[in-house]
């Protein structure tokens, strides 16, 4: 314990204690110390704070508990405010202090915390302060210290200085200010989850925690407080100190006077995300906010683009794509992500220009230094050279004026001689001598005179040679050019230095520093410089006379400057009038923690007209003024409220549809304001279709504009955004410039270019103008639907396709591919009618799309089961007249749902707030002819009665209105469900299945109102997902307004309303006698109803409207009433609400009802915040939409052309056109010696970051060739005679295939297909021997197998590792250590080099196991949005042929798990790393089959097995039986090898959180997870060593299969351990045991003869024997190569099958394959023949070659291989080998003894084997899976009592037709002729083939081709038919059919029509021909006999007259003619 007493070790000491009494005793003080802070935190911070903000608040010093429960619109801001008020400020208040701008209740809490808070001072500055402060203070602060709460941002330093001047005793102000520090450079928040803000002019709009209802506005200049160290006003100095920052909330201290130590300038730093700033682009300015990126992502991407071998253009974007969705990076802008990937892409090839040589001498080091520092040498040498050049030139210049007297060189006098002879005593003369004297120049006597120029100059020239006479003249000076030359020479080095600096290159050190500054910047910090400022004094109070301090008496006159009032106040008649208001009032202080009221409640500024100011001085305020409160006038009416800025006035969606709403009396819209201010426009603002009249197609021209002035616009032609003009020009031939000129001449500039023309392009609004000018009509085809715009009478028609951002001209018959299955859903006519419907008030229905709803049978089954059992609904109410029949109907419906398939219907959902008017437009829609066949379902009878009153139906139609139970028994085409969220869960699906006639469903409801709750405790309906979540995909818009609720309720709920009622909310102590009482509990409502009151429950009143006041009774149940039902209660009445009962239930306390309290106490709250979890994520509309406008926009591809064209073919794996950097070339050599590596250039962008893609560091091992493993001398086996065909004919007994199948949900499985299957060996197909698993042909395979193969968790909560799992896992680990002779306490150090090789091996396996095209097609497996714990389950396709499955029945399939690529790539190396150590430590007596061939297994058996009785074992549901103990066991294994903790935690997380498409799975083994085979094998080994004392007993293990050579003794502990395991053993004891499908024994291994015999039979019958013969022969040779001894390990019953297999191979195998049956080695001649074309070989084969073949192999070119060359790596590749043993695939080879195996692997690739070994591709049908089977996964059982099933026959092929090509030129000709007039006098029957019609024959005579586009028969009544209706039976058929008289309705499409009478007199009936069923070509190069034929029968009418026609029939249509024949047409 001494080590635990040192600091820092206490925590580890406590954690090391086991859960014993010692630990409990030691940790007792911890619990005691936590109790009080936890309780205090819960009391002080009770709000529910999201977990992502916990760490932020902890860093701010806020001690939150994390267990908060109370809801708050912005809890983090509230917590910071509370911390500042209750934890920080009380410590600053060391004396009496005043507090400003805080609510009285908060001040009371603050005062109770710190008594020094003496006074509260509040000023009402704006109207909303009336709700905050009950009164306005009339005095100024009177204490030395003042605390100003969240108001400093509204005051300037000059105003604060004025407060100090007004209060002389005031010394310091503690103030809190809410302002984002990043607003200094951006308008985008760095903490968007915490707050957002935006700029509006000089103001900043602050929005806390994503709650737009709580935003408020403050001046942007508030940021100056964070940038000020102090300020001076006049001669007074004030210091500003930043005490602390809590995110956007800052605490400041403002003091009077200069402190002794004061810094005028400093820097303030603020907390920001961990980010770096990207360098700005060259020569461009880019906002810093869009260059901030996360530092971790930047570092990872930097390394990624330099580590990948081949970098493609899309790789950085793919890497960034994996990070964009992470919530911690929500602060990063999309532009920053774009800049990051672009920066990484552009700079990927940049590397640091540094070197690290190893110097071998100082000279090398010096020379390298000189080469590196050339710039420094330049800088040092240039000044020296410049000085030297100047000195040299100057010296030479001084020599020029000297006169040379004597010059002697080499002893000879060159100039001058000695004047006296050389005497003997003279010394020798020097060999070099230069004697000079200064030259002279003429004196200056007379400037420029002839005397001076001629005489004196000549005299001086003559005297210069004489040293004596030259002294008489002045000394000559050097010429001036000498000085200039010296300066020029001195400037040369400096100029060279300047050029070197300008042209570069820079010094290596500078380049190095620039590289690191660019690519490795320092972390970005937000620093604001602070400095001293100077301000002018401003008035603190702008309300006329300033309040006075409490301690000062009111003076006689105010000497303070008078400022204009800040806000209007009530005038006092006793005072002088105040000066008029000169400015708009500044915003009032708004605390960050208190949400300001919604914008609707803010009144606009009211102009106050004040009388003229009197010159006299204003008198002193009277005592009445000091005691009065400043008040404001009444609030404006609700109609003047502003709308919520977050609620769009146009409900625009991403689908291209815009709902336009009728403008109300609101402020001008921005577009209107822009139009009004546009100088190029004139006239009023109106829609274009009103301005320019025309026959417009709705909704063409529905945009606002004004008339243009006479001058055309000067906006230039949008060259890069004119794709719409190009498309119109191509269609019409008009030049694009002409089209643009037309737009410029007709549209104002603000409409022509709204600011986005250059980037987003033209819109369909511009096309409307072109259509009006040039008479155009166009069909726009987009992925969201087709829309036709233009004029009805247009002269030009064409079609334009719109893709996002682009228009292009297409053919008129162009159409996008329809959604799969959408065209088969009926009700398309209803959908179109619903879209075209316009209500009487000119509004349209608020929905965007008609959705296709696919029913969920499980939900319907759940509800009908609960109804059947009496848990939900009242069956007696369904049909009160016959309750028994209703119950029978429900029971029948319950039975039908057991086998029902999902249905698809069309559906719209109108969702909106209570009273928004959802029912009223639907009631008018149901009156239209298309929707008259409807039925309405409502939750209550009250709502049913209201619907009847609304629609006033006829008596025969009242049945259409009913409750939800009775509606199930009715039938109609249209189903309307009102208050759908009040219905039971699953009602929508049940109602659709109950009525097969339903084609269209209309849902009405409000998701935030009450939902259905079953009253029976046994009901399972609540287990279904709620309706608001189930129906959310169908909510297109939410109608956020109300026509019902009064204004007071709307104000409280923050909801717009159109009601003019002011409303009221009051309390009454008595019940009303006539009003409706709403009660929470059903029992209370029943009691009041029994007493005669009209009382209903709140839940049952949902959907109802109360004209008078609603009486809400309060009781104890009201406190527990949900918010949804509380909202129902307060939104029923149109006039007001009266509360009765217990008033304490609405007193506003925490235990009271929140909504009732808010209404009664008039407290405002936000519905959008309160119900944010229930409201749909869709656009909100605040007014009824009035039209369906379509706005398409396109700019062409000039702005941003995509990398690939839209119609370009998909990229292939060999595409490298986007590779910009290729570093895959080897550094040294040609790469032939490197480890095999696959290029990753083809991988999806989101998968490449998961690959390290690094070359292997494994050195080349110089292995010696292995010695040849020659086989022993074996005796040739002798086989008893057995005919394969004879045995096969009797092998399969007579079998009823259907008796082996099973039924799942009424559908029979298909594991034994036998129909149309070929067979030749027996009486039936051999496929009946064993079940065939193929989900493509058996849709029940996977659903029926789920119950056996998968185990589900009860909820989405993770699986919890239980104590039992920990114990059992540790026991398994200890047993596994015993098996490998390890100590459980040993820990292997982590080897990073080996792990890197495992990563390479895993990546190589993943890249080579599938084709590159397959990997590219599976790009979604690396989708970052795919949760790693989400797994897709699918069935494994295989033919289960082994001894256990032969002659068996239905068998569950094996399930495979498809996991995210990241899981496989991260955890795969872990398993390979473990496998390396397992192979190293595995004892010789333990055999694991992975990585071994059957021949190696046979060798091991011969070496270790004995003739003893063996114990073989298998398990039932082995994967499903491994629970939490397996996870603990695997965790122990990874910890033993020191695997990084992150990988261990990831493995545990995935195992405990896995979920599938069928539901969440419990902890179990999944086939497909990394290391499935290894973990199964280890688990099996551990279990066997737990049960037995294995010791040295030989043990063979492979997955769940195992074999012991003999049964060891059982361990004593097994009896206690066995009950803890969930395993089911299948042990077999005997001398003949099988392992992995082989009989094994002391003589080797033999493939199980019955199983091999069955495989041969199946292959012969299905014709695939040619593909599988070599594989089966290889399996056979495993035992055959052992010689005659293998018979000792085969049971006697297997002998015939072994002989039959030998007989088959001898008679059917080709000669070259029979070589495999020979024992011993192959002859050398055969090897020579095989090695001729050999390019590579294994070591064993290489050892068998002769010298010539070895040289040939060594010098041959190496081909790429698909497997590693190292045998150890190949061995590590053998994962999941056991599963592959049973996988039946087309095989081409097998295993055989080494070296024969290698030899015949080469032979199989030889062309000498012939074409019989070619493998034909297998065509696979698409897989069909049910949607979800988790709940009914066990419905697999015996055959049902009834043998009814559906035999789905294939459809008949279409009849052959002559292919008609589309003509390039054609004419569409309309035609019409009258059939006859019908008088009714006699019956009529007529028919006609249109191809032989005289009218059409004449019309089509000049043409060779004629095609009917449309044809119909139209019947029109005549006036006499009013009293004599006449009936027609009409049908269209192919010409080959001729219906008899009156039999027209016996044919499909036949119709019976009645015309005339009082109803049908004014209608014309048309019967169109369905040309899809008939041949429309009535004339072609060949004749057809299936052209359209019409047949009509008309019975006689009583009283018919031959002269009085009753009706007339016409045939009319359109025929397309083409290919003129050229024949002459006779003239008329």
UniProtKB/Swiss-Prot annotation:
Residues 550-599 have a biased composition (Pro residues). Disulfide bonds: none annotated. Residues 544-603, 661-682, 1828-1854 are annotated as: Disordered. The record marks 822-823, 1194-1195, 1790-1791 as: Cleavage. Residues 669-824 form the Peptidase C21 domain. It holds the Pfam family Peptidase_C21. InterPro entries: (+)RNA_virus_helicase_core_dom, Alphavirus-like_MT_dom, DNA/RNA_pol_sf, P-loop_NTPase, Peptidase_C21, RNA-dep_RNA_pol_alsuvir, RNA-dir_pol_PSvirus, Salyut_dom. Residues 1508-1614 form the RdRp catalytic domain. Residues 65-226 form the Alphavirus-like MT domain. Residues 882-1039 form the (+)RNA virus helicase ATP-binding domain. One of its GO terms (biological process) is symbiont-mediated perturbation of host ubiquitin-like protein modification. Specific enzymatic cleavages by the host yield mature proteins. GO terms for cellular component: viral capsid. The active site is at 723 (for protease activity), 806 (for protease activity). One of its GO terms (molecular function) is cysteine-type endopeptidase activity. Residues 668-677 have a biased composition (Basic and acidic residues). Belongs to the Tymoviridae non-structural replication polyprotein family. This is Genome polyprotein. The lineage of its organism: Viruses, Riboviria, Orthornavirae, Kitrinoviricota, Alsuviricetes.
